[in-house]
């Protein structure tokens, strides 16, 4: 009986370890090599697994930045996205320009940017993820381009100054 209990405990421990390791995020050091570009921080990523980086992703912004122009390219690679929460709580940020190379605005990307008054969303963007502009207290109007087909939950939550928003008919 003791042997069965010990075996059961051992097997349970192995299963728990396997389960935990399978849900732990994996990233190689190459993927997470954060580099600076003006007020921005970025990483380069390999999307097709061929060992060559294909695009850049904005991962952070200097919290004292006032006006930011996201470049279309960094290191000759297109900037395709902003990481979740990349600009979050940049309270000095008043305006941001997003290039046509960007196709998605990450979760909480501009959340808490309380001074953000204007942003251009290019026609290349197809998705605005959850809480993207949450608590952007100075944002008064925004136009969503026809290319956007999905706006996730709370994208504009607590945008207390928002008085005008144009959303295309095809948005879900």
For each of these PLM feature ranges, what is it?
Residues 1-5:
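N-terminal secretory signal peptides that target proteins for export/translocation
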Residues 6-26:
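Sec-dependent N-terminal signal peptides of Gram-positive bacterial secreted proteins and lipoproteins
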Residues 20-38:
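Sec-dependent signal peptide cleavage junction
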Residues 41, 63-80, 91-104, 113-127, ...:
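Structural signature of tandem-repeat unit edges
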Residues 47-53:
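Acidic, glycine-anchored loop motifs typical of Ca2+
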Residues 83-86, 106-111, 129-134, 152-157:
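Consensus positions within tandem repeat domains that build extended binding/scaffold surfaces
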């Amino acid at each position: 009986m003791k042997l069965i209990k010990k075996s059961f405990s051992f097997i349970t421990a192995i299963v728990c370890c396997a389960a935990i390791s399978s849900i732990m995020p994996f990233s190689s050091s190459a993927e997470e090599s954060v580099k600076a570009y003006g007020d921005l921080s970025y990483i380069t990523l390999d999307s097709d697994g061929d060992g060559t980086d294909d695009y850049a992703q904005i991962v952070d912004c200097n919290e004292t930045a006032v006006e930011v122009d996201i470049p279309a390219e960094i290191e000759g690679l297109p900037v395709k996205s902003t990481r979740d929460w990349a600009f979050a709580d940049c309270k000095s940020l008043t305006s941001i320009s997003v290039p046509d190379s960007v196709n998605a605005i990450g979760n909480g990307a501009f959340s808490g940017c309380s001074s953000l008054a204007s942003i251009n969303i290019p026609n290349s963007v197809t998705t605005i993820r959850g809480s993207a502009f949450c608590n952007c207290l100075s944002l008064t109007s925004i136009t969503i381009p026809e290319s956007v087909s999905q706006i996730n939950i709370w994208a504009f939550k607590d945008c207390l100054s928002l008085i005008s928003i144009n959303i295309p008919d095809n948005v879900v």
